[in-house]
């Protein structure tokens, strides 16, 4: 029996489904987390062979001892994953220390975590990216901004999501940024005029896709976080060929094997000198894990399938026979607490209840980017989806 160590299997809350499908495939699933065992979902507890509680997952020594304990008790660990951006570097360090060769090692982390290092691999894939500057002095940053023109975007070179990400529109805003920024390495990029689209896939051991999908985010996540806007994004009914092509070239260039990926691109909404023409695909950043929150469930709703099983099949068998059913648009809307929406919950359910797949409160840890109350709805046409979004975000 193969041993799979799952780091923080309780977060996000839907990740118990990954553990359940691993168990169904004959894997011994060993959990490590800082949530008390009795507070784990019953479905998660029944999926785990054993759970090792640490006082804090932030304490590397504690987590190391947990993996060492499982190694002593059950033998060599075959897989170790969290499927969580926050722990990717921790996962890689543990794999390296325990000689677990089924995933990224510490030496791989620079190219998959640092936005500046990603640029060379996008170039290798033949995909253009925004010009950039690693922030050091105010004068050098000012010269870069003058070269590419305001606005510019600044964000941590190694960061999660849209945290600490800003659009700067003038020298004065740049000066304020330097006076108030955190003591981390920032990257500054020219502003790309485009809509974010993604290539989301489960990749096998030879770089082959076992499942492919994608989503579109009409609004900037940076703006959603910084301005507390509603969060909207949707799973595409059919993955455009140009996005699929860019995704697979990126997978090959980055050497991705045996994992879930969420690769972000821009589709240009206007011609942009040095980048391309309207409609061209531009590299944004790679995320070597599933798209966040409840997006895995949205793939299932959109394609009448089960990505938790497909992923677990990839781990256990390096293939999957799980079928894809009818295809739909699956539209997420995250509303904000306290805002006066024209349609209250009852009106929303009366109008869209037939296609509503999920609704409920979003965990506070995700609410900055995803809103406070989520509605996830299947729709069959783009026109129906656009009407749904108009109704969902309209205020009184």
PLM regions with names:
Residues 190-256, 260, 267-271, 275-278, ...:
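ATP-dependent carboxylate/phosphate-activation module, predominantly the ATP-grasp catalytic core
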Residues 51-58, 133-137, 166-169:
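Short acidic-hydrophobic, aromatic-tinged amphipathic segments that line or gate anion-handling sites
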Residues 128-130, 151-154, 163-198, 220-231, ...:
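Conserved ATP-binding module of the ATP-grasp superfamily
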Residues 310-396:
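Peripheral (often C-terminal) accessory segments that flank ATP-dependent C-N-forming ligase machineries
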Residues 62, 140-141, 173:
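Short acidic active-site motifs
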Residues 70-77, 147-148, 181-183:
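Glycine-rich phosphate-binding loop signature in dinucleotide/nucleotide-binding domains
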Residues 1-105, 319, 382-395:
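ATP-binding N-terminal substructure of ATP-dependent carboxylate-amine bond-forming enzymes
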Residues 95-164:
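A conserved helix-loop-beta module that forms one wall/lid of the active-site cleft
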């Amino acid at each position: 029996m193969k041993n799979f160590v799952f780091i923080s299997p309780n977060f996000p809350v839907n990740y118990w489904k990954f553990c359940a499908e691993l168990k169904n495939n004959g894997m011994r699933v060993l959990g490590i987390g800082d949530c008390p065992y009795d507070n784990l979902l019953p479905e998660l507890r029944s999926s785990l062979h054993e759970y090792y509680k640490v006082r804090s997952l932030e304490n590397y020594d504690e987590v190391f001892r947990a993996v060492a304990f499982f190694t002593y008790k059950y033998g060599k660990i075959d897989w170790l994953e969290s499927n969580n951006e926050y722990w990717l570097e921790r996962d890689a360090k543990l794999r390296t220390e325990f000689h677990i060769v089924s995933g990224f090692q510490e030496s791989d982390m620079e190219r998959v975590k640092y936005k500046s290092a990603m640029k060379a691999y996008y170039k290798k894939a033949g995909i253009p990216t925004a010009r950039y500057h690693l922030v050091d002095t105010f004068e050098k940053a000012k010269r870069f901004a003058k070269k590419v023109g305001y606005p510019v975007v600044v964000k941590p070179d190694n960061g999660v999501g849209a945290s600490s990400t800003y659009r700067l529109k003038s020298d004065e805003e740049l000066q304020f940024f330097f006076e108030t920024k955190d003591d981390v390495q920032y990257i500054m990029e020219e502003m790309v005029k485009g809509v974010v689209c993604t290539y989301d896939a489960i990749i096998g051991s030879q770089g082959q896709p076992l499942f492919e999908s994608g989503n579109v985010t009409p609004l900037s996540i940076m703006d959603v976080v910084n301005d507390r806007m509603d969060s909207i994004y949707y799973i595409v009914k059919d993955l455009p060929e140009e996005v699929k092509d860019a995704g697979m070239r990126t997978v090959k260039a980055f050497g991705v094997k045996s994992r879930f990926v969420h690769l972000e691109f821009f589709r240009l909404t206007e011609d942009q000198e040095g980048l391309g023409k309207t409609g061209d695909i531009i590299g944004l950043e790679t995320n070597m894990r599933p798209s966040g929150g409840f997006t895995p469930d949205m793939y299932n709703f959109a394609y009448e399938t089960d990505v938790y099983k497909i992923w677990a099949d990839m781990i256990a068998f390096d293939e999957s026979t799980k079928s894809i059913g009818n295809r739909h648009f699956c539209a997420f809307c995250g509303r904000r607490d306290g805002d006066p929406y024209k349609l209250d919950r009852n009106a929303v359910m009366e109008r869209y209840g037939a296609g509503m797949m999920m609704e409920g409160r979003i965990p506070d840890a995700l609410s900055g980017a995803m809103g406070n109350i989520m509605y996830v709805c299947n729709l069959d046409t783009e026109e129906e989806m656009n009407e749904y979004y108009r109704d969902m975000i309209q205020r009184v």
